[in-house]
Amino acid sequence: MATSRAFTLFAFTLSLLTVASTVSGHNITQILSDTPEYSSFNNYLSQTKLADEINSRTTITVLVLNNGAMSSLAGKHPLSVVKNALSLLVLLDYYDPLKLHQLSKGTTLTTTLYQTTGHALGNLGFVNVTDLKGGKVGFGSAAPGSKLDSSYTKSVKQIPYNISVLEINAPIIAPGILTAPAPSSAGVSNITGLLEKAGCKTFANLLVSSGVIKTFESTVEKGLTVFAPSDEAFKARGVPDLTNLTQAEVVSLLEYHALAEYKPKGSLKTNKDAISTLATNGAGKYDLTTSTSGDEVILHTGVGPSRLADTVVDETPVVIFTVDNVLLPAELFGKSSSPAPAPEPVSAPTPTPAKSPSPVEAPSPTAASPPAPPVDESSPEGAPSDSPTSSENSNAKNAAFHVNAPALFTALVTIAATSLLL
């Protein structure tokens, strides 16, 4: 009997471990890699870095296009426009085939990734999902007067309450999304103008006076990421006097604030390795590492951290961020010294209590609850981004299940063990 209970408990625990690992994360590139008919869609997710953004989020639905539908979209438009169109196919809520046919009132508006980019005007970043007659489900722009030009065709993959991948027969086209002007070389390469407008005039002036702006501009076509300190960041305590640096050191410092690749926020959130900068060379690493705190991205130099504050521009293949601290490379300013460990407290000898003649019996005090242990308020590294805005009629239970999966798993194991061993 005991052996049977132990085996049952083992099987139950194993099944829960499977569930726990299932809800822990997803990789859209791997999900689509086994299906050749989505190879073009998958390739564009990687080129535009939307794959990283999708992987950094939870409770999400991706509406995929087969190669035929994708060619009609990608063949006629630049990469920046394709990215906007594809971001409209990423719904910030979980929709599986069952939920599509159980919409309250048969229709709903749901938020998409496009709405979070800042490019969507009004409600152009929302999608209309409608359960049609005959078991069909239509998708269209939420803009007034828009038609349901796209239809659900089949399910591709579901990781319950985490990610759902559904195929649709045509892209969802919001008014103006395909006619949006591609970033011109003059517009994007006017980096100093963008920086000055964003409150980074000191940084912009240094780029011009040092000649590093030419390095930035020559990198634009292949990809460029800039971390621009604000004017206030240069006035902060601890920022070294740049006049004490050699010209070569100033150049290295400024180049340390840029990457020779397009790396938007979603890519930085999922990054695990050291990142090479424009200053990286054989003589020194000059690299950066990243961590996350909720939806925030923090850059680490070895000297001190700096938080991504705002996005100045994100137009494939160029992204410019403002940061709240000047990035100080350890190669120039040395690594931050770790605080010395606190000395161990010296134990005082325990005094021997004096013997009392006869103890007086005191009334039993009311038992008090022990104080709760201190709670670490800092988010763990790699913590998931903040939950996206739920669409109308979204399933709150689904979101709760995903977020609380570890706690639920622990509780279920405890209950199962107790019931089986009694």
Swiss-Prot record:
Give the Pfam families listed for this entry. Fasciclin
SUPFAM superfamilies reported for this sequence: FAS1 domain
Enumerate the SMART domains for this protein. Answer: FAS1
Gene Ontology CC, one term:
secretory vesicle
| Biased amino acid composition, Pro residues | 340-374
Query: In what residue span(s) does the FAS1 domain sit?
Result: 26-172, 187-327
| Residue ranges annotated as propeptide in the record | 399-422
Cell compartments where the protein resides: Cell membrane
Q: Which family does it belong to?
A: Belongs to the fasciclin-like AGP family.
Q: What does this protein do?
A: May be a cell surface adhesion protein.
Q: Which PANTHER family match?
A: FASCICLIN-LIKE ARABINOGALACTAN PROTEIN (PTHR32382), FASCICLIN-LIKE ARABINOGALACTAN PROTEIN 10 (PTHR32382:SF71)
Q: What is this protein called?
A: Fasciclin-like arabinogalactan protein 10
The record lists the organism as Arabidopsis thaliana (Mouse-ear cress)
